A protein has these predicted regions:
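N-terminal, polar/charged subdomain of small-to-medium soluble alpha/beta proteins
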Residues: 1-84, 90-122
Length: 122
């Protein structure tokens, strides 16, 4: 998961300069605490459904003004601070990109990524 590489690859695509005025990036990392109750987290186990992620991205790339979407997720046992999820939405104007980005993030997190947190005693 290399944010700079992904951005460079998007910029190199034919039509980029004709269709893109903004890119939004989400680089999710493992927290050292649980969102639910702020209990300490020493690691998490992550799995994802790549086919589902790809389908969501393809669906959302059909929206007005969206040029491309990239979604990558790490799997396995991860520690606090490790990269977990990388999302990039490239499109024409902020109104189109922001709305798509917000829904993309929510859908991928709820439909395609499964996380199990482990506390210090695990």
């Amino acid at each position: 998961m290399d944010v700079n590489k992904v951005l460079q690859e998007l910029k190199a695509r034919p039509g980029f300069t004709d269709h893109v005025g903004m890119m939004l990036v989400h680089n999710g990392v493992v927290r050292g605490w649980s969102r639910k109750d702020h209990a300490p987290v020493s690691s998490i186990t992550v799995s994802h459904d790549q086919a589902k992620m790809d389908a969501i991205c393809h669906e959302m790339e059909q929206r007005p003004g969206i040029f491309a979407i990239v979604a990558q997720a790490n799997e396995g046992d991860l520690q606090p601070g490790d990269d977990l999820l990388l999302l990039v939405v490239a499109g024409d104007i902020r109104e189109n990109v922001k709305a798509t980005f917000a829904e993309l993030l929510d859908r991928i997190k709820s439909e395609a990524v499964i996380k199990q947190e482990h506390g210090p005693e695990a």
